């Protein structure tokens, strides 16, 4: 997390941190071939296939066919990294847009609503991070559907709470029933 203030969220910041830690652990004796292995690992990370979780594509297809919603990917991270990950996922046909921000804050959600000319109360954010996806939206008066994932980055851990605009789901497919 030390490189996040400089580089934000993303694979490139992770790669730099990995290199810095390797230098530290080796006592500054990291060899060129070891650096090459770490760089290769970082490049592989940037090219991993973006396989959607079970039920995501089916659910997005149902929501798209209903034609009642503007579906937007709103994510944080490094622009090129996130755009490439999105394209590799194969989910582009289901969305109207992708918006990448350096961090998900109340201000960034408000700007998202302004961009699409909607009131905050019309926004439903679906996500797995209570800190980034859910809490800022609830604070603004929007709606949020929290679908926890079995692992979470320590940086994203916060105390979760109940809220009248909060939907707690176990599976992405449940969106078909609640929307």
Model-derived features with residue positions:
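A metal-dependent, Asp-based hydrolase signature
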Residues: 1-44
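Asp-based, Mg2+/Mn2+-dependent phosphohydrolase catalytic module
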Residues: 33, 57, 61, 78-179
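Polytopic alpha-helical membrane proteins, predominantly small-molecule transporters/carriers
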Residues: 49-50
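Conserved ATPase "switch" residues in P-loop NTPase domains
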Residues: 64
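Glycine-centered short loops/turns at secondary-structure junctions
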Residues: 67-68, 141
């Amino acid at each position: 997390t030390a490189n996040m203030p400089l580089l934000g969220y993303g694979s490139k910041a992770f790669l730099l941190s990995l290199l810095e830690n390797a230098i530290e652990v080796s006592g500054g004796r990291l060899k060129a071939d070891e650096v090459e292995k770490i760089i290769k690992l970082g490049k592989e990370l940037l090219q991993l296939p973006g396989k959607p979780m079970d039920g995501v594509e089916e659910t997005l297809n149902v929501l798209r066919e209903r034609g009642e919603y503007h579906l937007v990917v709103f994510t944080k991270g490094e622009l090129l990294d996130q755009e490439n990950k999105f394209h590799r996922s194969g989910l582009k046909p289901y969305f109207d847009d992708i918006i990448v921000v350096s961090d998900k804050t109340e201000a960034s959600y408000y700007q998202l609503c302004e961009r699409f000319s909607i009131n905050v109360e019309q926004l439903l954010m679906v996500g797995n991070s209570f800190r980034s996806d859910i809490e800022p939206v609830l604070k603004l008066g929007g709606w949020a559907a929290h679908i926890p994932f079995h692992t979470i980055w320590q940086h994203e851990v916060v105390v979760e709470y109940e809220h009248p605009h909060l939907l707690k789901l176990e599976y992405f497919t449940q969106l078909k029933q609640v929307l």
